[in-house]
Amino acid sequence: VMAVPYDMYISGYDTDAVNKLVLWSAKSPNNLDMTAFSRGEYVRSLEENTMAEVISKILYPADDHIEGKRLRIKQQYLLVSASLQSILLKHIKKYKTLDNLPDKVAIHINDTHPALCVPELTRILIDEYGYDWDKAWDIVTRTLTYTNHTVMSEALERWPESLFSAELPRIYQIVLEINRRLVQKLNEVYPGDIAKIEYMSPVAHGEVRMANLCLAACHK
């Protein structure tokens, strides 16, 4: 799946300032399956592209069923990954390094929907730019901030661990490592208090808790 950017320029009131809002659309690299088309399977020939476009067709699709949950996590990952990759590419082009990313860029996680920023930024720095974990995590924690808009625990996004690991296996690996390191620190602060440590952990009781993940990584 490819994320295609659409830039919308927004002018301010009574000022010369213009801001850019980037919207993303999901597309398949293969618009048409010519093999299926040649066999007369016209609907099937468009299936791959159609399924890719579904990801960004409706923002926040209903997730009261398993297919809706799968679609929503794919959508969140696409928007997060595309935005982060765009930010980092522009930063590299200008500064030739990502070492100074926290000094030049602030990435704000507004509620839990973009919380995948935490593991995805970590993944990009490690897998695509060759940072070791400690350096990557230092950059992540100094770049990301988080706002939570509710105190109701039922409104904080949680994913079934089985779904999360199936849809985002590499991201799941990184989340587990974040969780392992955090639990290790919590054990030093609250030795033996298993209930408190589980309550604060990003991964516990078969769930991946996005708010806890943000709190583990964000400096504000």
Predicted features and spans:
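A conserved ligand/cofactor-binding region detector
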Residues: 1-220
